[in-house]
């Protein structure tokens, strides 16, 4: 006996409706963070060739404002990003301990290559090395949360 395709599809959809992924446990989260820091993200020992200066920080803030604010907000802490609570995996605050524990070289590697499948795109070929390193300086000295307002793209 052949079941109509709509019956099979309906049974499959009902079965899938009950499926839900649980958030990772603490040990799963810590394992992923450890693996990212020690195995998946390159350039751990690379040093930022740009010294910290207000001009380099301003350059980093400018580059960040063109390429990063849609997901990370003007302050790097997701302020004013309307979809922030609906993204999986979640977009981290760049002030978080997890992000700040990367070396400068690892942060540049992430900016260059992105983190798949998180949605973080790579910028290799789009931004110069100096722009990337200046963004790293900006990330190390983020302004206070909420102090930069909401990205313009979300206020119109």
Q: Language-model segments: which ranges?
A:
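Electrostatic cytochrome c docking/interface patches
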Residues: 27-63, 150, 156
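C-terminal motif of bacterial Sec signal peptides marking the signal peptidase cleavage site
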Residues: 16-18
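Sequence context surrounding c-type heme c attachment/ligation sites in exported
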Residues: 58-69, 84, 101-106, 126-129, ...
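Flexible coil segments in periplasmic/lumen-exposed cytochrome c-class electron-transfer proteins
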Residues: 24, 42-46, 65, 118-156
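Extracytoplasmic electron-transfer domains, predominantly the class I c-type cytochrome c fold
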Residues: 85-141
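Sec-dependent signal peptide recognition
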Residues: 2-9
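Bacterial signal peptide processing site
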Residues: 20-22
